[in-house]
Structure formats: C-alpha cells, structure tokens
Design a protein with these regions (language model features):
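Short intrinsically disordered, low-complexity coil segments enriched in acidic
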Residues: 2-3, 18, 25
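Bacterial N-terminal signal peptides
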Residues: 10-20
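Bacterial N-terminal signal peptides that target proteins for export
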Residues: 1-11
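Structured catalytic-domain cores with a bias toward divalent-metal coordination
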Residues: 22-453
C-alpha cells in the first residue's frame, strides 16, 4: 500500500472512531452508478443472454476446469490475448486455464511479450528442469516477475515433465531487442565439450550478428549492405548445422548433448534475428515475424497462444499510427488468427504510480482502479450477471445492442503505470469484432503478487 493511501486510511479510521463516540453506527452510503442509456441497457441484455461464465483457477478451483473457448478458437493457428488491464492476479490464471484447455487442440507453445533469448531459458526449464526460473523471470522485468507467472511456469513444467518433446508446451518470448544473451550461450560452450578450435570457429561466424546490431541503420557500413546480411545468414546457418553435428558426436554424454542442444536453439534465435534484420521491416512486421517463427517451432500441426501486453494482440492502429503486430499476423493467417481482449471492471491492480509533477513513475504498488467511465464497456459489463465472462463478439448483428457493442467505445488501458488521481485517461477505443473477436471480463480484479526470492 502506498504512503498516501496509508495516510488516508489512518485519517479515515480516526474520523470514524471520533464519530462513533457521538453517533450510532450507520451503514455506508453506496452511490449507485448512473443509469445506462437505452442502447447500453440493450447491450447489457445481449451480454446476459450470450456471455459464458468461466472459473478462474485458484486453490479452490484447479486448472482442470476447462475454459469455454474451444468452438471460438476453431481451427486457429494463433490465439492472441491482449492484457488491456495489466497487473491483476487473475490474468495469469486465465492464460493458464486457456493453455490447459487448448493443449488438447494442439497448442504447443505460450509466447509472452518479452525478450526471446532470455525467455528461452524458461523454455529450457519447463522442458528439462534445468535452470532457475525465478532468476529469469526477474531478468524479464517487473511485469513478469510475479508469483502468478511463476505458478504458470510451474504448471507448464509439470505438464511437460511426463511428455516427449513433440507433446510438450514451450515457453517463449516474441521480442528480440538484441541477441546478446543468445550469443553469450553460443560462444561460451566449455572447450571440454566443444573443443577450442570449434569454439573459435563459432565465435568468428557469429560475430556478424553483433556487428549488425551495433551498427547505425541507414548509414554507411555493413548494416546497410544486404551483401553483409546475406553472408551473416549463411554464417549463422553454418553455426546451427555445426552445433547439430557436434551434438551427434557427443552420443553417450547426455549432459554435454543437452548443453549443445540448448546452444543450437540459441543459434536458431540468432539465425532468425539475422534473417529478419536483412529485411529491415518496421517494428510491427518484425514482431509479427517473430510470432510466426515461434508458431513454426510447434510444427505444421502445432498452434501458439500469444500473451500481448496492452493492445499488442489487437488488429488495430493506435495513437500516432502505431500499428500492432496482430495486423500483419492476421493478414498472413486470415481466419486462422483469433484474438481476445481482457479487461477488469473494478478492484485493485499492481502498477507504477504516476502523478502530476512526476517525470518518471514510482516503484510498483497496489493501486485501486477508478470507477469505469460512463458509457465505457466496463460501465456496462460491471452490471452483467457473473463474475468472470467470456463473450464471443463475432455473432453481433445489426440491432441496437450489437451496434452499441461494436463501438467504437472506450475500455480500460492499464499498461504498467497508473494514477488513482484523475489525470490521464488510461483508456483506449475498441471496436468489436474489428479489433477483437471476443472479450474476457473480470468484474473484481485483485493485484498481482511480486515474486518472492
């Protein structure tokens, strides 16, 4: 709890104690929300008739309870979910439940919006038990360093423990700010495993990735030369092949083979980085290429669940003409891309506070959400029946309720920072099913818990 909120709580407690000496206890005054417009009331009736309630996993409700989304997902190759309201306890459990449900439908990977190479360390852990997942969740940043994400990682580990590689669920990151960690893994194999000569060869071949990443794009030099990148693609491919051959030569040395296999996986990341770098794509197309590449790791029949922060998984262009990666992903996959938005009606989230006069947000704390804006999706959904709802928006028609639900209409957008004071909108306009095929709504959010060391 923040100092400001603690002070307010103490003042409120003192006031109540003084008041109780002179007056009898009176029930708190609950201010009813403004009545819905006729069209919003029609939308509420539609939601109550069509929404499907679901159970969020917790100690009382195991993850074996299935999410009601199989028909919605259909033959989708990629399911993207936008975490519009970040910092809740509930969302990681919902993603865990979705993954458990869709594992029987060939979903073989979860990709989060985090650095790819570092997240590969968590992938190695869930598949083999090697490594320290808490260390790597810390490395991914505050958003991922929570008890809820750790619980999700442990669930994937237990799922994978008794399954072969083809049936396991992978844990990936779909951003590559740089390939530094991948290169470190590739170039630090012990000489006792790879040999000094082999390691020297690998370091020479892979150096081009570092050169390309450190160069200034659009200026004179190798990074502006397609010939350089073509050579780099060939060099990284030779490293991948050489590590595969080394792994074969290490037959009978299981620990050494596992070490080399992981280095080969990191070499594939570097190879993919070089391949995408050659094409000099804008950010949204680059990220889309990462997502589609991760989907390919699951095989021709494998599918991928994508956890996008804020509106990343939406088919939309935001402020400043910022195009989201889901736009090119959907263009490539067509109806084999499905997506959902997640939002919360009220409650408390974990976020970094920002207030008037602050140039930078403060450290993370628990923050109470402001009441929903009148006319917003949350304002209407807060009055729906049920605590947690899944709504398939693809069935909207042309009646009054459907017109209201289609939008554009505002929804919460809490992306790492927030203010309990009335500054900033912390909202984004949505349209259904143009931006999202469906919606996941939780009426009362509670804050995520920082991961204990």
């Amino acid at each position: 709890m923040s100092t400001r909120r603690t002070t307010l709580a103490l003042c409120a407690t003192a006031t109540l104690m003084l008041g109780s000496a002179c007056h009898s206890n009176t029930p708190p005054v609950i201010v009813a929300p403004p009545p819905l417009s006729d069209s919003a009331a029609a939308a509420l009736r539609w939601v109550n008739a069509h929404a499907v309630p679901f159970t969020i996993p917790d100690s009382m409700h195991p993850v074996t309870d299935r999410m009601p989304i199989m028909d919605f997902v259909g033959n989708a190759r990629v399911l993207g979910v936008s975490e519009l309201t970040e910092g809740t306890h509930q969302f990681a459990g919902i993603m865990q439940s979705i993954l458990a449900t869709l594992s029987s439908r060939g979903f073989r990977g979860l990709a989060i919006q985090a650095p790819m190479a570092e997240t590969m360390e968590i992938d190695r852990y869930v598949r083999t038990g090697t490594g320290d997942p808490k260390r790597w969740l810390r490395a991914l940043g505050l958003h991922w360093n929570t008890q809820e994400i750790f619980t999700l990682v442990q669930w994937v580990r237990e799922y994978d423990r008794s399954r072969g590689p083809a049936e396991q669920i992978g844990f990936y990151g779909f951003e590559i700010p740089n390939a530094a960690h991948a290169l470190q893994v590739i170039t630090t194999l012990p000489d006792s495993v790879a040999g000094a000569g082999f390691n020297a060869f690998v370091r020479r071949q892979i150096q081009c990735v570092t050169t390309g990443e450190s160069a200034a794009w659009g200026r004179e030099g190798p990074a502006s030369d397609s010939t350089f990148w073509n050579r780099c693609r060939a060099a990284t491919a030779s490293v991948v092949d050489s590590l595969g051959a080394l792994q074969s030569r290490l037959a009978g040395r299981s620990s050494a083979q596992a070490m080399v296999a992981f280095a080969q996986q990191m070499a594939r990341v570097a190879q993919h980085d070089a391949d995408v770098g050659l094409r000099r794509l804008p950010r949204h197309e680059t990220v889309a290429e990462h997502i589609l590449w991760l989907a390919s790791l699951a095989g021709s029949d494998g599918n991928l669940l994508v956890w996008g922060r804020d509106v990343e998984s939406g088919r939309l262009t935001g402020e400043g003409n910022v195009v989201q990666s889901a736009v090119p992903v959907a263009k490539t996959l067509g109806d084999r891309y499905r997506n959902l938005a997640f939002t919360v009606g009220e409650g408390v989230v974990r976020a970094q506070p920002i207030n008037v006069g602050q140039r930078e947000p403060g450290g993370e704390t628990d923050m109470r959400l402001r009441p929903p804006r009148v006319g917003s999706y949350e304002d209407m959904l807060d009055r729906a029946s049920g605590e947690a709802l899944f709504i398939d928006m693809r069935t909207l028609g042309t009646d009054t309720a459907s017109t209201w639900l289609k939008g554009p209409r505002s929804a919460r957008l809490v992306s790492g920072i927030y203010s309990e004071n009335p500054i900033g909108s912390f909202e984004t306009p949505l349209q259904f099913p143009t931006y999202y095929d469906g919606l996941l709504f939780v009426k009362h959010g509670t804050p995520a818990t920082p991961l204990r060391r």
